[in-house]
């Protein structure tokens, strides 16, 4: 009982940090202060997206990744993908039960599928590692490897959000209405061909090729490569190259590396990511307070999916993978895998709704509720996870 209480105190400290920094962002967004208004949040969000997050992911991943560690972490991309797939299934159940308006289906599905694999673990892991007598051993090595796990998790989450969730929300937010075939097109389809069979065969081959070309062009227009290859994704790729190629690693990474100033500079810039992202969350919560129009049943459905059913699924998957020897016995690694199922929705969903122009205010309401209750969920579940893996 005493050990469980100690774990509860350990897991509650990072949540208090999140609440304090979030309250600063909330205060700065008030009309009377107006230091973090709509435009300021937009510009700060761009700085986080293009500068802070890539620097953070690149520096942490390059520092911790090696061939051996990458082999050990092979299950993490699979685990992150499973959080998205299971979340999507739970989101679809929420949609079926609560019957929201059609233009909000993509938002609800996205909130259940995409978790905040960025700044939440980035705050929780270092805070947990710093605690004396924690379940993860030496604080310095805990933070080094823990941040490497989080950086890979953040990179994979970014890829899945901008490939899977982005297109899922786009399809559900903009369902095209199929036009019925015209009389002329039906008439043309029944015309008797007046050309030879050989010419007809050639025309059919040409028609098939043209159809394939049209589909490829249509696919390239629908899939936005800029969103897939986001700055964080590119930074993760560069970090993997540096970490895995030994000569490059010795040149840049380490206390005796000739170009270690590059690593130190990128790390220094990346350290601004966590406070900036957390203050943006605080500013966005104020917007949620001023919004309305979201069905309470849909909000409750998202909360149950994200904070009850998804973490329970995570326990079954991660512990099952451990029993099957798919995951190593390292407690910190298992804790990060479990934590991926218990985080609130990704803040990038707000950016996606802005791109589509639908569900912006409703997204703010969902974020208000989910991040307000995250203080409870991110205390209770990590306590249980630490007890489970210790």
From Swiss-Prot:
Residues 36-43, 98-107, 166-227, 287-297, 353-364 are cytoplasmic. One of its GO terms (biological process) is endoplasmic reticulum to cytosol auxin transport. It is found in: Endoplasmic reticulum membrane. One of its GO terms (cellular component) is mitochondrion. Induction: Up-regulated by auxin application. InterPro entries: Mem_transp_PIN-like, PILS1/3/4/5/7. Residues 1-14, 62-76, 129-144, 249-265, 319-331, 386-390 are lumenal. Pfam families: Mem_trans (PF03547). Its main location: endoplasmic reticulum. Keywords: Auxin signaling pathway, Endoplasmic reticulum, Membrane, Transmembrane, Transmembrane helix, Transport. The chain crosses the membrane at residues 15-35, 44-61, 77-97, 108-128, 145-165, 228-248, 266-286, 298-318, 332-352, 365-385. Expressed in seedlings, rosette and cauline leaves, flowers and siliques. It is a multi-pass membrane protein. Signal peptide: none annotated. Belongs to the auxin efflux carrier (TC 2.A.69.2) family. Involved in cellular auxin homeostasis by regulating auxin metabolism. Regulates intracellular auxin accumulation at the endoplasmic reticulum and thus auxin availability for nuclear auxin signaling. This is Protein PIN-LIKES 3. It comes from Arabidopsis thaliana. The gene is PILS3.
